Amino acid sequence: MIIEWVPYNNLQNIEYLTKGGISEIYTAVWIDGRYEEWDSKEQKLIRYGRQEVILKGLENVENANQRWFEEAESHLKISNKWPQIVQCFGLTQNPSNGNYMLVIDRADIDLRKYLQETQNQLSWKERIKIAHDITLALSIIHSESAIHRDLHSGNILYSKLNQRWYISDLGFCGPADKLTDSIYGNLPYIAPEVISGKNTTKKADIYSIGMLMWEISSGQPPFSYYENDYNLALNIINGMRPKVISGTPLKYENLMKQCWDADPSNRPDIDTLFDGIYSLLQYYQNISNEILQQETNNNLENNKIINNSMSKHINSTLFTSKIHKFKNLPEPKNAIEGMSRKFSKVFKKLNIKSNNDIQINYGKEIVEQQQIRQYNFNIDDEDETYDYKNFHSEEDNVFEIPDGKII
């Protein structure tokens, strides 16, 4: 694939679409379109023709360091090498302000909007297919020794033509001039170790997948009722996770929980995760349509209750990738770890002389009840409750964008 310089005057019908994190997003029509094939007779590349594209602004590129440019260049090559990643055709520059912009293939809808529009109609077979496509794309990214760093439902995109889900924003998911002591990302999806200041690794991407798996199961973004970033960050580090949705397949649930474990070493690598999702998809593909339809009907009312209750609490400002800077946060832990330590101390002080296991189990039960009251809101009469993740951190460093047509 060729990554090229796209003259700004080759773009028409440029219209503002939205603000995506630190970047302004526009739609446009590329007059010539991408290179599509090689004409052996004419001995030249043939272009696609008029093509709808997305323009994504790159802020403060002039202040970026060499490491940022090297990583961006590497990720551009990955996105154009593999069909599971949204293709970036090249770069252009807005002459009115001098800002550089990525020229990206346009998809039909992102995962967040798709789930909100179709959740009540989705079978588990369809949901697992979404998880399959996402994990397949991430397995390719990780196989190239790359890390995404900002996986969330806003940059998982769907193509109706190909009936496939893609990962987008690879390599350009943060400001070029981000300070080294800050993190960038969509807070509900950021891994706890990254929130607490550690470097981003592939296992941080796996954590993000766990939260996406929960969103696929519920139809709603995780932690959507939170108003305060610091409180959410602290609760994530202390082990708060979303409540598993009723009816979630056990294997899917177990994989999801492994992904969002507080200890990165306990999370599966992407190959193990993909194999698990793939085997689950194979199972559901062998189930008869009658059973799948019955399952969909059974989930319909339950999902309506979940969506109606949670949509009232969604904080739209939370689900934007941005720079975060948290100080003096504790080490990440799973919720049960904290409960065990806390209540063993309490029982010692009370001088209760009974079996230690009974004490700790009793303590856990009390804390779980207290934590539900503290962190969740009730969904129905059966006290089904729903909680809710982020990721990003690495040091940056600049190469100049060349004047030539091919980068």
Where do the language-model regions lie?
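Activation segment of protein kinase catalytic domains, centered on the conserved DFG
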Residues: 117-129
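Glycine-rich ATP phosphate-binding loop
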Residues: 24-59
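Activation segment/activation loop of eukaryotic-type protein kinase catalytic domains
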Residues: 154-188
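Catalytic-loop of the protein kinase fold
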Residues: 142-159
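Conserved short submotifs of the Hanks-type protein kinase catalytic core
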Residues: 97-110
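Conserved catalytic-loop aspartate of Hanks-type protein kinases
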Residues: 205
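Short beta-strand micro-motifs within the conserved protein kinase catalytic domain, predominantly
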Residues: 87-100
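A conserved short helix/loop substructure at the end of the activation segment
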Residues: 243-246, 260-272
